[in-house]
C-alpha cells in the first residue's frame, strides 16, 4: 500500500508545484495528518465497510474537512472513491519526503544524555549539514542516558554516532580482535 500512497503523494506534489501551492498544501497536509494520525484504524473500517458508498465516504470528507485546499480535497475524494482514506498518513509521509527533497532538507533526531544548549545544537546542526550536504536540518532532540556521554544524530538512514557508548563498543571490538 505504500506504493499506492506514493502515487497519490507524487500527484499532489506535482500539482502543488504546477500551481505554486507547495507551502500551503504542505501546511494543510501537516494539520490533516495530526488530526487523523490516531484514527487510522477507524479510517480502515470506513474503507472496508461494504455498505458505505463512495458518495457517503465523500460526504464524510466534506463534513470533516470543510475549509481545505481544493487540490487536497480532490485527492481525498479520490482516496474515498478507491477505499484508500486510511492511507492519508502514508500519503503525508511520502509528500513530506518529496517536499524535503525539493528543498534539500530533512529531519534529524539528536540524542544526548542531557538537554543541549542552543550553542551546542547549532554546532551539531552545522556538522550534520556539512556531513549530509543538506541545506536545512529540522531538529528533534531526545535525552538518552544510555549514550553515557556525547551525542548521536539520525538523519534518514544515516547515523552519526559521537557517543561514549559507541566509543566503548568500538574499543571492545578492537580488544576482541586482539585476543
UniProtKB/Swiss-Prot annotation:
Gene3D superfamilies: N-terminal domain of the delta subunit of the F1F0-ATP synthase. GO terms for biological process: proton motive force-driven ATP synthesis. GO terms for molecular function: proton-transporting ATP synthase activity, rotational mechanism. One of its GO terms (cellular component) is plasma membrane. F(1)F(0) ATP synthase produces ATP from ADP in the presence of a proton or sodium gradient. F-type ATPases consist of two structural domains, F(1) containing the extramembraneous catalytic core and F(0) containing the membrane proton channel, linked together by a central stalk and a peripheral stalk. During catalysis, ATP synthesis in the catalytic domain of F(1) is coupled via a rotary mechanism of the central stalk subunits to proton translocation. This protein is part of the stalk that links CF(0) to CF(1). It either transmits conformational changes from CF(0) to CF(1) or is implicated in proton conduction. F-type ATPases have 2 components, F(1) - the catalytic core - and F(0) - the membrane proton channel. F(1) has five subunits: alpha(3), beta(3), gamma(1), delta(1), epsilon(1). F(0) has three main subunits: a(1), b(2) and c(10-14). The alpha and beta chains form an alternating ring which encloses part of the gamma chain. F(1) is attached to F(0) by a central stalk formed by the gamma and epsilon chains, while a peripheral stalk is formed by the delta and b chains. NCBIfam families: ATP_synt_delta, PRK05758.1-1. This is ATP synthase subunit delta.
Amino acid at each position: 500500500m505504500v506504493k499506492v500512497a506514493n502515487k497519490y503523494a507524487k500527484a499532489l506534489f506535482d500539482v502543488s508545484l504546477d500551481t505554486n501551492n507547495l507551502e500551503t498544501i504542505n501546511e494543510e497536509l501537516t494539520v490533516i495528518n495530526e488530526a487523523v494520525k490516531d484514527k487510522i484504524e477507524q479510517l480502515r473500517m470506513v474503507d472496508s465497510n461494504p455498505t458505505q458508498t463512495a458518495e457517503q465516504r465523500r460526504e464524510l470528507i466534506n463534513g470533516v474537512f470543510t475549509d481545505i485546499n481544493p487540490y487536497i480535497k480532490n485527492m481525498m475524494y479520490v482516496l474515498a472513491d478507491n477505499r484508500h482514506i486510511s492511507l492519508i498518513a502514508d500519503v503525508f509521509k511520502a509528500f513530506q519526503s518529496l517536499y524535503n527533497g525539493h528543498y534539500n532538507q530533512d529531519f534529524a533526531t539528536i540524542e544526548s544524555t542531557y538537554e543541549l544548549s542552543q550553542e551546542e545544537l547549532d554546532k551539531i546542526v552545522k556538522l550534520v549539514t556539512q556531513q549530509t550536504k543538506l541545506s536545512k536540518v529540522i531538529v528533534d532532540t531526545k535525552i538518552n542516558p544510555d549514550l553515557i556521554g556525547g551525542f548521536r544524530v539520525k538523519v534518514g538512514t544515516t547515523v552519526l554516532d559521537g557517543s561514549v557508548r559507541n566509543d566503548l563498543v568500538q574499543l571492545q571490538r578492537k580488544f576482541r580482535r586482539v585476543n
